[in-house]
Amino acid sequence: MITKIHARSVYDSRGNPTVEVDLTTTDTGLHRAIVPSGASTGQHEAIELRDKDKTKWAGKGVLKAVENVNTIIAPALIKEKFDVKDQATIDKFLIDLDGTPNKAKLGANAILGVSLAVAKAGAAAKKVPLYAHVADLAGTKKPFVLPVPFMNVINGGSHAGGRLAFQEFMIVPSEAPSFTEAMRQGAEVYQILKTLTKKKYGQSAGNVGDEGGWPDIQTVEEALDLITDAIDKAGYTGQIKIAMDVASSEFYKEDAKKYDLDFKNPDSDSSKWLTYQELADLYKSLAQRYPIVSIEDPFAEDDWEAWAHFYKTSDFQIVGDDLTVTNPIRIKRAIDEKSCNALLLKVNQIATLTESIQAAKDSYSAGWGVMVSHRSGETEDVTIADIVVGLRAGQIKTGAPARSERLAKLNQILRIEEELGEQAIYAGTSSEPPHLYIFI
C-alpha cells in the first residue's frame, strides 16, 4: 500500500528543472523516478507543465507540476489504497484525475513521475526486476530480447550548433553477437570518430551536443562520410549500419509547404527549399551511397501526404516520432494511412506506463517495429532500459556512448544481459526477430 508520495524539482542534463517523485509503500520502502524532457517536441505530445515565470529558470520551472503531485495526486492516490502491482488501474486513476486529453491540467511531467514510481514499487512488491514486471504488464512472450543500441554520434538540428539540419546520425551495431559486443563496437567507432572530427574541424570539435554526439559538422554528406570512415577504420564495415533522425518538423516551412535544410541561417535562400518529393529523393540517394537502415521523422508531423508517398516508395525502417507522439489516436491514423512502419516510444509523450505499453502493442499488431527512446533533456533514471527489455522492442535510442545520463541506460542493459544470461537473445542476431527487424 502507498503511504507517501513526495515530488521535488531537480535538474536534467541541460540544467533545466524537472520533476522527481518519491513513492513509499508499507512493504518495500522508497521508489524514485525522474522525468525527462525534449528539445524538439511534437505539438501533439502530452503537455509538460512549466511555470512560465520568466524571473526563475527563464520560465522553465516545474514548481506547479511538483505542487500538483504533492497537493492533488498524492492525497487522492493514497486515499484509494490501490495495490501498486495494479499499474493499469492506477494509471487510469491518474488520467481521470487530470481529466484532459493531453494531461494539461496536472502536467504530463507530474503524472509520469508518479506512474513510473508506481511501476518500480510494483516490481519490488512482486520481488522481480522492473523489466520482468513490465513484461508481465505487457504480456510479452519469452525469451527476453536485448535491444540493438542506436548510438547518436553526430548531433545536428535543434540539439547542436552549426548548420547541420538533420538532428541525429546514429551508428547501429546490429551484427554484433551480443549487447556487450555491440557496446564495444559502438564505443570503438565513437572514439575513432572523435579523433577524425577533431583532426578535420579542430580541437573545439571535441565538444559534444546534448546527447553526446559531435556537433560541429556542416552538411549531411560530411556527417555520413565521417561516420563511414570511422566504421571502416574500426574494422566494422558491413557490420555497423547507420540511422538518422531528421526531425524535419523543425525545418518545415508550413506556408510554403517546403523543407529548409539551411533553417539555422536567418538569410536562408527560399529558392533552395525542397518539396517533400525532392526531400524523399535526397533520402533515397543517401541510402544508395551509405548503409542507412532507418530514418526517423523524415517529414513534418502533419505532412501526412509526404509520409504516405515515402512509405510506398522506400524499403527501410521509417520511424514515426513527432508524427505519432506515442499517442494511440495518432498511431492508429499512421497505421491506417500507411505512413510509417515503426514507432519511436517516448514515455513522456503520453505520460503513463500503461499507455506506453498499449502504444507498443498497437504498433506490434500492425507489424511495426518499436524503438524505445530517451529525450535530449535526460537524467540518471534508467527506467527506459527496463522498458525496452520488458517490451521486447529490440531497439533503443539513448544517445552516444558518452555523458553519464546516456550511459546510465546502456550500463543498465549490460547488467540485465548479465543477469539474464541464456534467458535473453540479442535483437541484432536473433533468428527470431522481435518484430520489424527485417530492415537491419
UniProtKB/Swiss-Prot annotation:
Keywords associated with the record: Cytoplasm, Glycolysis, Lyase, Magnesium, Metal-binding
Pathway: Carbohydrate degradation; glycolysis; pyruvate from D-glyceraldehyde 3-phosphate: step 4/5
Cofactor(s) this protein cannot do without: Mg(2+)
UniProt-annotated binding residues for substrate: 159, 168, 296, 321, 373-376, 397
Organism of origin: Tuber borchii (White truffle)
Protein name: Enolase
GO BP terms in the entry: glycolytic process
Cofactor remark from the record: Mg(2+) is required for catalysis and for stabilizing the dimer.
Active-site residues (renumbered): 211, 346
